[in-house]
Amino acid sequence: MIYGSLDHGFIEVIVGPMFSGKSEELIRRIKRAQIAKQKVQVFKPAIDDRYSIDKVVSHNGTNINAISVVKAFEIIELLEEDTEVIAIDEIQFFDHSIVDVVREIADLGKRVICAGLDMDFRGEPFGPTPDVMAIAESVDKLTAICVKCGNPATRTQRLINGKPAKYDDPIILVGAHETYEARCRKCHEVPRT
């Protein structure tokens, strides 16, 4: 990725299913910016507390400190003037105001790196992610490996008690006992009834 002068702002988006390495890639980009002596601020939605409330944590345990926010506009309120790079994990959990927040920060001449799921467990566009992708200068769509057949996986399979979640189940489950797997288009199952 060639960024050129950052005085005009830049939006990067990292998407894909669970287990595709989105948070790991986000952390890698953050660390590279820090090595280059760029000031970085990292944000995440407060609803994402599966591993830590104040860290972005990948499934393999790699982590970096983050500021947890409830509402997207808090990112602008907490943004420090000399920050050059802003990283936002799990963007799908924010409401659609995250689109305007990301745009506003980029318009300040900042590099904004967002990561999140582009599709929900149904295989449908997830929250504001598609709209953030649309305004980005760069989108990287990562894949995982399908646990059923070994092909590239682009979808997240939700399992409840070992069975595929039904289409009408809630999109976001907080504190539920569900598990997830990476699946390809063919092996992804979402029963309608």
UniProtKB/Swiss-Prot annotation:
GO terms for cellular component: cytosol. Zn(2+) binds at residues 146, 149, 184, 187. The keyword ATP-binding applies. It is found in: Cytoplasm. Its main location: cytoplasm. The keyword Secreted does not apply. The active site is at residue 90. One of its GO terms (biological process) is DNA biosynthetic process. InterPro entries: P-loop_NTPase, Thymidine_kinase, Thymidine_kinase_CS. It is an enzyme of class 2 (transferase). Homotetramer. Belongs to the thymidine kinase family. PANTHER family: THYMIDINE KINASE, THYMIDINE KINASE, CYTOSOLIC. This is Thymidine kinase. The lineage of its organism: Bacteria, Bacillati, Bacillota, Clostridia, Thermoanaerobacterales. The gene is tdk.
